[in-house]
């Protein structure tokens, strides 16, 4: 009885509602990669229905990327991503958490970012990036770092409060340490639009891996974002690029935020539509392809029109891989894969 008593009611409902029509099998990235029917939405639901042992559930549900693709091909709309979340709740409580996911969550809770960098290292990375903006653009970026008690200018390290028109930016930690062009673009564009940018050293990441671990930690990380918003009291909260992070943030953080929340795509699209943001088209040497992130096309707050409009303005024609954004295939980044 471990399974039915340990997982949430939606998981049990979906397990008994599944008609085993097999529509979900060929659309599941786990199945396409492994060829194992147990690594399909249908197979996973049958494991729940059969009250499978924890070890069996772990092997199958640890390979689900929570991409939600199955939900849009299922005649009943059964969302096995949510089933996976409820099963992982029970598995985590039983001591069977996915190790990588648990490590990332622990990094965020201890350091405020998923890669486990101490706040001083995050500050050093931010300072290095704003100096690159100075060299590239010849302008001094208005970026401030908040440590929970004071604001410092990222460029010279001096204690200084930002102006009244402030954007609290939650970037991806990978944008600070790997895809730094994205972070520099955030700061430069937000400055152009008249915002002083603040990055909290206590929550310098968009990704909420609690979504992949269990509900308790998902809410705990969401509350960390809310605490920074209350402390900084920005004019607007700007969320960087992260699919599942936006899915969770838009549901758990945005409704409780005392400041308006915008995804970076939403904010830039609005300013572009108003004519405030000018985008100069470039000549792409090779075809440009757009592939929707799972949680931009199938998440709680879809983002499909905005990135396409911005991409079209930047490169002109581009290639669509799918007839419908909701059909996009998962990149397998979800869940630590």
Language-model-derived ranges and their functions:
Residues 15, 45-246, 252-253:
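Iron-sulfur-cluster electron-transfer modules
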Residues 23-29, 33-36, 72-79, 299, ...:
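Short functional micro-motifs and their immediate structural scaffolds
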Residues 171, 265, 292-294:
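Short, structured patches in soluble enzyme cores that scaffold and shape functional sites
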Residues 219-227, 267-276:
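Active-site glycine-rich loop that binds ribose-phosphate moieties when present
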Residues 1-64:
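Ferredoxin-type iron-sulfur electron-transfer modules and their immediate structural context
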Residues 246-266:
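Short acidic, glycine/proline-enriched helix-loop-strand junctions
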Residues 4, 41, 274-337:
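Redox cofactor-anchoring modules in respiratory/redox and cofactor-processing assemblies
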Residues 18-24, 67-70, 332-337:
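Cysteine-cluster motifs in flexible loop/terminal segments that predominantly coordinate metals
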């Amino acid at each position: 009885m471990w399974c039915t008593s340990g997982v949430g009611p939606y998981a049990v409902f979906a397990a008994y509602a599944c008609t085993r029509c097999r529509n979900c099998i060929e659309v599941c990235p786990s199945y396409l990669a492994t060829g194992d029917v147990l690594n399909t939405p249908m197979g996973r639901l049958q494991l729940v229905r059969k009250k499978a042992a924890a070890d069996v559930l772990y092997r199958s549900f640890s390979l689900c990327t929570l991409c939600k693709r199955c939900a849009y091909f299922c005649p009943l709309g059964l969302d096995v991503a949510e089933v996976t979340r409820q099963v992982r709740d029970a598995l985590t409580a039983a001591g069977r958490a996915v190790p990588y996911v648990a490590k990332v969550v622990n990094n965020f809770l201890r350091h405020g970012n998923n890669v486990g960098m101490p706040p001083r290292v995050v500050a050093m990375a931010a300072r290095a990036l704003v100096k690159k903006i100075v060299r590239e653009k010849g302008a001094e970026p208005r970026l401030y770092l908040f440590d929970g008690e004071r604001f410092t200018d990222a460029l010279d390290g001096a204690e200084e409060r930002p102006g009244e028109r402030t954007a609290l930016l939650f970037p991806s930690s990978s944008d600070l340490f790997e895809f730094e062009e994205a972070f520099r673009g955030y700061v430069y564009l937000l400055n152009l639009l008249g915002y002083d940018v603040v990055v909290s050293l206590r929550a310098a990441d968009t990704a909420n891996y609690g979504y992949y671990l269990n509900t308790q930690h998902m809410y705990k990380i969401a509350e960390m974002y809310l605490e920074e918003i209350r402390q900084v009291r920005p004019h607007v909260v700007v969320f960087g690029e992260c699919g599942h992070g936006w899915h969770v943030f838009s549901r758990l953080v945005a409704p409780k935020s005392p400041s308006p929340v915008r995804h970076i795509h939403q904010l830039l699209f609005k300013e572009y539509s108003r004519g405030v943001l000018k985008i100069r088209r470039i000549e792409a040497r090779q075809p440009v392809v757009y592939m929707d992130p799972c949680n931009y096309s199938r998440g709680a707050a879809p983002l499909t029109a905005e990135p396409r409009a911005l991409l079209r303005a930047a490169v002109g024609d581009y290639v669509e891989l799918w007839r419908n954004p909701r059909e996009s295939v998962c990149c397998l980044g979800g869940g630590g894969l």
